[in-house]
Amino acid sequence: MKKTISSVVVALLVNGAAIAQIASPDESEAIKKTALDYIEGWYAGDAARMERALHPELAKRMISTDPKTGRSQFNHMGAMALVQRTRDGSGKKTSPDRQSKEVTILDRYNNAAVVKIVASDWIDYLEVAKFNGDWKIINVLWELKPKPSE
């Protein structure tokens, strides 16, 4: 009986520690800050802020449909290309009143998290990892929102 109670107590403690890691407000704020550096950096054309958010090996990917053939196509961009597009001001084309940046942490465990950003014309799903003490975006899967019917 003592063994069973001890096992239950240990299981509860381990589970509680895992829940504490998932719910840690400090880590959640750090993850959110990384996501905001990414999206706000994009809108502002702030390449330094964008670069701070990204791991150098980042892969940003999107599956789109070729309008001529109707077939899926794979689009890929690396960290430096994204930083350069930010520096070039591509994000500044979105007017300030349309610069949506709704950030939601979908899941987190230890040093990995998944974050959703609802932006003006697209949705980003970020895979974020703690790397040398800082949260960095490792992967982004994104998709354009459908255009409103006219």
Predicted feature residues:
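Surface-exposed, charged secondary-structure patches
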Residues: I63, Q73-W122
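Ligand-binding grooves and catalytic loops that recognize ribose/phosphate and carbohydrate rings
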Residues: L58, G78-A79, E143-E150
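Positively charged n-region of N-terminal signal peptides that target proteins for export
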Residues: M1-T4
